[in-house]
Regions:
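A conserved pocket-lining segment of Rossmann-fold NAD(P)-dependent short-chain dehydrogenase/reductase
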Residues: 134, 165-178, 188-212, 216
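C-terminal substrate-binding subdomain of Rossmann-fold SDR/epimerase-dehydratase oxidoreductases
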Residues: 202-204, 209-316
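N-terminal Rossmann NAD(P)H-binding glycine-rich loop of SDR-like oxidoreductase domains
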Residues: 4-23
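Conserved beta-loop-beta element that borders a ligand/cofactor-binding pocket
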Residues: 116, 150-175
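NAD(P)H-binding glycine-rich loop region in Rossmannoid oxidoreductase-like domains
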Residues: 53-92
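Glycine/proline-rich active-site loop of Rossmann-fold NAD(P)-dependent oxidoreductases
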Residues: 146, 159, 172-187, 214-215, ...
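Conserved Rossmann-fold NAD(P)-dependent oxidoreductase catalytic core, especially the SDR/UDP-sugar
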Residues: 73, 98-140
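Short, small-residue-biased leader/transition segments that mark boundaries at the very start
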Residues: 1-3, 247
Length: 316
């Protein structure tokens, strides 16, 4: 097996590439764009290639050169960034996905393209949002994710391409710094706590969103591609869930271990509006039943691990 991970130096890709290499003996090609070259262990642990997701020929040449049979297509702009640059978000998110699916159709590759809680909108059921429900987002990020789900399903039904996906909640990581996503406050807050800084929260109290610790997210992305296809009723895309909280809950959980931590609110209207359009929590029954999904971390175990890892990182 040889896997190409596009967006390999991004928020998810940098960690997913290393996880895949640990499982598949380094036989993973890290795709990147000029100016975002892999560094350190990511560079040294396996092959890498410049791949412009908007260039179908370049994708095809890379797939052919490395005999790739599975593509993890992670190239995308984050939610708040996509709102600032909607044209670029569509070009990368949908133009890039179309190119990947065309190459997969022609060359027999399986494709994983992550979706998101961003596919849902204001009139979606907010609590325990069902697997199959209304998807009408009001952000370009969400529009590209819904369109990506539909296009991926089309390529599976029409051309037999093995497309699979999960709807990621907000992903929380101690490895990759936050990069402008709506849920990134839940990463920033740990950084501030460990550095001994006051945290200014851009999301209002009582705003609940689904979140997940990155190790669970990486495992979900791998397990869905390893799942028995005969048992998959859904493909693009599965709800997956781990925990749901608002800023007060995560703040109080951090205070269990760092009592002097202090948080104030400085709400960002753009990110707040996006957050309010997303579900409070997801129903992931289908993922559990069809391919055995089960998270390993809850809020408290994540907090303990995040604080421990960041203290080592910042010598605290």
């Amino acid at each position: 097996m040889c896997i190409r991970d596009s967006g390999s130096t991004g928020q998810i890709g940098s960690e997913l590439t290393m996880k895949l290499r640990s499982i598949y003996n380094g036989n993973i090609v890290a795709g990147y764009i000029p100016g975002a070259e892999p560094k350190g262990e990511l560079k040294e642990s396996g092959p890498s290639a410049i791949v412009d997701i908007t260039n179908e020929q370049q994708i095809a040449e890379t797939v052919s050169k490395y005999n790739i049979d599975t593509i993890y297509n992670l190239a995308a702009l984050l939610s708040a960034v996509a709102e600032a640059k909607p044209q670029l978000a569509w070009k990368i998110g949908m133009g890039g996905l179309f190119n990947v699916l065309e190459v997969a159709r022609e060359m027999g590759c399986a494709v994983f393209t992550p979706s998101s809680i961003g596919v849902f909108g204001n009139n979606t059921p907010k609590d325990k949002t069902p697997q199959d429900t209304i998807r009408n987002p009001r952000t370009m990020y969400g529009v590209t994710k819904v369109s990506g789900e539909l296009l991926s399903d089309y390529y599976h039904i029409r051309f037999g391409v093995d497309t699979r996906s999960v709807r990621f909640p907000g992903l929380i990581s101690y490895v990759t710094p936050p990069g402008g996503g709506t849920t990134d406050y839940a990463v920033d807050i740990y950084y501030s706590a460990v550095k001994g800084e006051k945290f200014e929260c851009p999301i209002a109290a009582d705003t609940f969103m689904d979140m997940m610790y990155m190790p669970d997210g990486l495992r979900a992305a791998i397990e869905i591609m390893e799942a028995n296809p005969d048992k998959l009723i859904h493909r693009n895309s599965f709800n997956i869930a781990s925990m749901s909280f608002d800023p007060e809950i995560i703040c109080n959980n951090i205070k269990k271990y760092m009592p002097d931590f202090h948080m104030e609110y400085k709400v960002d209207p753009l990110r707040q509006a996006i957050a309010e359009s997303w579900p409070n929590s997801l129903d992931d029954t289908c993922a559990r039943e069809e391919w055995g999904w089960k998270p390993e971390y809850d809020l408290d175990s994540m907090t303990q691990d995040m604080l421990a890892k960041l203290k080592v990182r910042f010598n605290k």
